[in-house]
Amino acid sequence: MSAGRTFEGAGCVTWWGFGPARDLLNSDTHKVRLQEELNVLLVGSGDPRHILKTITGLTHSDTLHVWVIENSMEVIARQLLLLYISLLPPDKMSVHKKTEVFLEVFGNLEIRKETEESVKKAAAQLSISITYSLSSDSLSHSCLDTSLLKFKERDELVRIFKLWERPPSAPASVSKVWDARVRQHLGSRYDSRQGAFDWDLNMKLHQRGCGVINKHQYAKWRETGVTFEMREGLYQTANQSLLSTRVFNHRGNGVALRGYWGDIVSSPYLSFGIETENKELLKTQNNHYVKTAQDISEVNLLELFECLAARGRSPLNEDPPNTSSSCCQSTESRKTEENSQSDPSASQTQPVEHSPTQELDLLNVNGVKVSFLSPDSLSKLPLKSKYRNLFNTIFCSASMVHQLDSALREIAAPDAALVIELATFLLDLSKEQVSGFAVKVKEIAEESGFTPAHDQNSDKYAVFTQKNN
């Protein structure tokens, strides 16, 4: 059963998750046994939220290997782009600017010209590095591994990155593309769409625990596809990373159309903006949240990027930092970084523009590696001895649940956890369908040799642990 396949609101391409970021090795419902290397398999996560969150929970001695399967190369390309931005060293981009750029690329169909330049630069470097990996056994970066993809898949990645680097000179209006999706989804309700937006927010998202999503910001996204506006400026440039090709049947012939085929109802706020450990951000006044999902997304990502900077090291720095005490930078070092960003003389010492190199000039995050697997690889993993009993945690999105079967037990490590995204935030589903989906998920997990974890009270994810034989 796949809850997210053809429901028009959710779209057919998963650009972001339908649930908040989780530490997949350590949570209230399960803790993975510590060992030399921890292996996590992500099936259809759509974005790097779980990767970033899981890294924050690592100790200085942990080694983490994340294996990623997505259902299209366009989603893999975007995952690589978002990880590239996440791993930019502080001397290239401060954590504050990185947070803004990440969120803009992550959730906005239209971005600022400055942000487009960041995307083009990243695409150019990723294209060169993957081309290099095609002719060499060496990895272009210790954390990002595309070597397990087929040659034709890596060729496809290069094609996508070059399209981002040099987009069409006369592109179709993405605002019209977005509006066409909204019209198709709402049908006769289009002329009263503000009422439809309010209904989805108040009667669905707010009722399902997303009260921090602001009415005006949500309506702006539903109307225009622009989610995050941290800076004043013109958000008028197409975000190429959110555009993909879909083949339609026209009079018996396949017609490929490039457009936006992702979510138009649930919102990008779900990944980073609806949960926080900082209770100050959840304060209310007159029964309204003082802060918004955008504010929470900014704070959460800032903390995640500070953790990456503390665990990682610049390619020019041979000595890894001490991460045994805390993964967050000190306030003093953060101030120093901000001062260097605002000091004109400091900025003059930085290189202005360099042509892309084979080596990705990114943070080397100590003990962390992310490997991308082919979209059709899930059913083939049990056939390869290297994956047998390998994964400590297996995550599966709501849109990919239909691919799970009893072969899971062959690739799951002893005491492994299975985490499945539920359909709570697929707004086109009725309450009965959401409940039915949860029942189906439980059946699939049990048939695969897993049992529900104790003390579960989440309606966002179902967590299972491997049965003891």
UniProtKB/Swiss-Prot annotation:
InterPro entries for the chain: DNAAF3, DNAAF3_C, DUF4470
Annotated knockout phenotype: Static olfactory placode cilia; reduced movement of debris in the olfactory placode. The morphology and number of cilia in the olfactory placode is unaffected, but an abnormal ultrastructure in these cilia is observed, including reduced or missing outer and inner dynein arms.
Designated gene of the protein: dnaaf3
Pfam families (alphabetical): DUF4470, DUF4471
Expressing tissues: Mainly expressed in cell types that express axonemal dyneins.
Compartment(s) where it occurs, according to its Swiss-Prot or TrEMBL record: Cytoplasm; Dynein axonemal particle
Location of the region described as Disordered in the Swiss-Prot/TrEMBL record: 313-356
Compositional bias segments (type: Polar residues): 320-331, 339-356
Keyword Iron-sulfur: no
Family per record: Belongs to the DNAAF3 family.
A single GO cellular-component term on record: dynein axonemal particle
Main location, first listed in the record: cytoplasm
Keywords attached to this entry: Cilium biogenesis/degradation, Cytoplasm
Protein name: Dynein axonemal assembly factor 3
Top-level taxon of origin: Eukaryota
Protein's job: Required for the assembly of axonemal inner and outer dynein arms. Involved in preassembly of dyneins into complexes before their transport into cilia.
GO process annotations (BP): axonemal dynein complex assembly; cilium movement; motile cilium assembly
UniProt KW Ribonucleoprotein keyword: no
